[in-house]
Amino acid sequence: MFAETIAGRWTAEKANKWYAQYPWMAGCDYIPANADNQIEMWSEATYDHATIDKELGWAEQLGFKTLRVFLSSIVYAHDSQGLKTRMDDFLSVCASHGIKPMFVFFDDCWNAVSSYGPQPRPLTGVHNSQWVQDPSCDLRLDTAKLYPQLKRYVQDILTTFGHDSRVLMWDLYNEPGNSHHGTTSLPLLRNVFILARQCHPQQPLTAGIWRDTKDFKPLNDFQLSNSDIISYHDYHGSIRHEQEIKKLQALGRPLACTEYMARTQGSFFRTIMPLLKRHRVIAINWGLVTGKTNTRYAWGDPHPDGSEPDVWFHDILRPDGSPYLTQEVNFIKAQTK
């Protein structure tokens, strides 16, 4: 790797010392079942303390100790104090259930353009039909205007919560380069690391690699050269997943798998969770309670009539908290106890 390293990156020794204070952790990428995207989760009119408290109680019963949660720059732009107040409330709910979440700032996945206010209804049977990229792509061309706005957002959040012991870590950018952005996302990725380092948070920073192809090498090299904790996404089966773990272990830093478990892709709790536990990799699967994001449906396999998929893609629980697969839930509890 010959990527630039922004000043302030933790040494491997500091990162490993930080990780040594924690037992092995499992958790999930989380959004409440009644929100269809990040904007709906965090907006004042739709933030739902009671549902979050209920669902995190179920997460606690599974033995989950962390969550990965996506923030919203659009909500911040329209209601900065409100977003921080709701984040504080969310962290209090997490703490009451023994959970330390990580927060995600930027995202290159799904819908390119988004707006504040009431969100479109989810498309029946379509995976993540209303999830939004962040920042909205219509804002990205005018970087002279956008970057100062993002500076205020990122640094206000990190100044407010960067020394809050309820936060596990900061995931600065989800899947940079996705949605055909490619290396055009590198300036924004670099920018968010610079902004975050200037705040000197007590928690580690990361940005997970997710596609190991030649065209993504500039992004991957930058992410691996700047993350305090190495994070990655892997929806493959156990053999290929373990190869990825061993390759990343050579970097000498703690590892977090921040997305896995897609049943129809061959990524199962029963095969991947024990692998992650054995290698002491933080295990974060996509989805807790199935709901408006429709992530029980697979990528590219819509069910416009709303019929149930033969096999759920993501998610663990039904909206009433009952398991999709009782045997699977029992297995998760056995791994996390």
Task: Give, region by region, the residue ranges found by the protein language model.
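Active-site mouth of glycoside hydrolases
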Residues: F2-S227, H233, S238-R240, L251, ...
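Structured C-terminal subdomain patch of bacterial secreted/periplasmic proteins
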Residues: Y297, D301-P302
